[in-house]
């Protein structure tokens, strides 16, 4: 029984047609096929027992089938050939497979059966119940049932491949996917993907032999009423359909991006994900609190380093000034800074022995070498300077400098005449010191055997301050302790040694030492 299948839907002028054989009566064989996710084709085969007939389809790439029937046993043999073609695609894409008429349904071969093609067309015969077989189970509905309209949601393309460099086809309007589509997308339904044979050779499904059978269907049989809609989906293992929240119980689309877009974005640009946006400086933290802490730590560190640099610079500058050479000319002495404790008084109130060294009161260097003193000495001489009194260190420094200038320039001495000077502020100003011979008596016999304690001021009628008397005791004890003064020393007045010298007159000063142990 030769017949011809329509290969393309667009080439079938009438998918449902009537075939009448005047010799054998209303015997027909109608076939329907399911597409492998690509195109639906309806095929019709006309049964003629004596001569071969050919379907009037005009489509390109028709499939031809041949069958033979023995009239003695009324056996029908149907052969159907399926051509599978592989389109040329890139190496990186999957092959696109187009399958035409993969199954054949034989509706009726009985002589008394109703012509199904007449039922499908505009005939006057009554149609029997519709049989719908879907995914392994069969459900029967009466004609014009409302369930048939609900089932006809159109064909769904479940496999789509786009070659690299090929323009993407815009998706159709979003529609509610059927139950089968959801199962396929969620991975609950396994879909067999047909593979193309090697070498492009055609394959057949074999031969079918029927004997004394009525209303036999091979494969799926589908009835479509209304327009056919093709939907495109991408199949993977992820759950594409998730139940939505709320009373409606709708479906959420996980690919939807509901974030606000930034004004001025380029057309077609995607919303930037803050978690995926690389930071400008990866080594820096992202939170505001950490940034504040980082800035604070950096600021404190820089401030600390700056303080160290300033302290080091100031210390070096101070040492340079202190180690500068003091010259004897007046122009240089005017520019010598006072960077010591020159403005500080004796905070001990005379109870602490405090020396003001030559460098601190800005003494001139000696004009020549001064002879050494034979130590320990047994004589300590007290005498006045016959200058104005002083009660602060600043004034006392001025008095000492003036005395040195007078002794060097007027008296033609090599240095200030006294070993030590005691001021009203309670400080001891170092003159020639412990080891050098003084010029206080202008007599070599006394000067070479004694130390001189000069009291700044005139004490003919004014007594020395309590600070001056207190530091005098401390100075004598320090000399004995250092081995500069003999333990059995004699403490006396210059006027007693040279009564004729009027400059040594200081009765109020000498009277202050009248009850001292070593005074004589």
Curated annotation (Swiss-Prot):
Organism expressing this protein natively: Drosophila melanogaster (Fruit fly)
Membrane protein topology class: Single-pass type II membrane protein
Changes seen on gene knockout: Larvae infected with Gram-negative bacteria fail to induce tracheal expression of the antimicrobial peptide gene Drs.
SMART domains recorded: PGRP (SM00701)
Gene3D superfamilies in the cross-refs: Peptidoglycan recognition protein-like
Protein's recorded name: Peptidoglycan-recognition protein LC
Post-translational modification: Proteolytically cleaved, probably by a metaloprotease such as Mmp2; proteolytic cleavage leads to activation of the imd/Relish signaling pathway.
S-S pairs: 390-396
GO biological process: antibacterial humoral response; defense response to Gram-negative bacterium; defense response to virus; immune response; innate immune response; peptidoglycan recognition protein signaling pathway; positive regulation of antibacterial peptide biosynthetic process; positive regulation of biosynthetic process of antibacterial peptides active against Gram-negative bacteria
């Amino acid at each position: 029984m030769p017949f011809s299948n329509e290969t393309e839907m667009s080439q079938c002028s009438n998918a449902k047609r009537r075939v009448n054989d005047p010799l054998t009566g209303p015997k027909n064989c109608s076939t329907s096929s399911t597409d492998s996710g690509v195109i639906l084709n309806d095929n019709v085969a006309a049964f003629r027992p004596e001569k071969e007939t050919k379907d009037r389809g005009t489509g390109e790439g028709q499939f031809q089938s041949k069958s033979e029937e023995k009239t003695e046993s009324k056996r029908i043999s149907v052969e159907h050939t399926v051509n599978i073609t592989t389109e040329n695609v890139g190496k990186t894409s999957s092959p696109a497979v187009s399958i035409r008429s993969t199954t054949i349904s034989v509706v009726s071969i009985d002589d008394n059966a109703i012509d199904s093609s007449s039922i499908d067309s505009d005939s006057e015969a009554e149609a029997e119940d519709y049989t719908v077989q879907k995914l392994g189970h069969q459900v029967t509905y009466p004609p014009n049932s409302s369930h048939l309209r609900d089932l006809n949601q159109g064909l769904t393309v479940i496999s789509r491949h786009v070659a690299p460099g090929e323009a993407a086809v815009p998706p159709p309007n979003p529609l509610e996917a059927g139950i089968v589509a959801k199962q396929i997308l969620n991975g609950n339904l396994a879909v067999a993907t047909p593979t193309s044979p090697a070498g492009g050779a055609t394959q057949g499904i074999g031969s079918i032999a029927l004997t004394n059978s009525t209303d036999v269907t091979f494969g799926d049989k589908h009835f479509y009423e209304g327009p056919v809609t093709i939907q495109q989906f991408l199949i993977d293992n992820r759950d594409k359909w998730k139940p939505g929240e709320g009373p409606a119980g709708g479906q959420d689309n996980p690919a939807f991006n509901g974030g606000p877009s930034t004004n001025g974005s380029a057309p077609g640009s995607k919303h930037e994900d803050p978690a995926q946006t690389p930071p400008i400086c990866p080594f820096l933290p992202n939170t505001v609190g950490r940034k504040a802490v980082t800035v604070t730590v950096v600021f404190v560190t820089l401030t600390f380093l700056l303080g160290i640099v300033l302290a080091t610079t100031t210390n070096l500058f101070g040492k340079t000034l202190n180690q500068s050479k003091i010259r004897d000319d007046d122009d240089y002495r005017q520019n010598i800074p006072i960077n010591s404790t020159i403005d500080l008084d004796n905070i001990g109130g005379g109870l602490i022995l405090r020396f003001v060294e030559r460098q601190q009161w800005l003494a001139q260097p000696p004009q020549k070498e001064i002879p050494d003193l034979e130590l320990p000495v047994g004589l300590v001489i007290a005498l006045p300077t016959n200058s104005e009194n002083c009660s602060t260190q600043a004034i006392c420094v001025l008095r000492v400098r003036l005395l040195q200038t007078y002794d060097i320039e007027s008296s033609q001495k090599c240095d200030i005449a006294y070993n030590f000077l005691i001021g009203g502020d309670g400080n001891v100003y170092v003159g020639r010191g412990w080891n050098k011979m003084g010029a206080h008596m202008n007599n070599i016999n006394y000067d070479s055997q004694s130390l001189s304690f000069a009291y700044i001021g005139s004490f003919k009628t004014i007594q020395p301050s309590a600070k001056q008397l207190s530091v005098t005791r401390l100075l004598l004890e320090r000399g004995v302790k250092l081995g500069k003064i003999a333990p059995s020393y004699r403490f006396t007045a210059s006027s007693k040694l040279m009564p004729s010298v009027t400059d040594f007159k200081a009765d109020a000063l000498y009277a202050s030492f009248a009850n001292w142990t070593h005074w004589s």
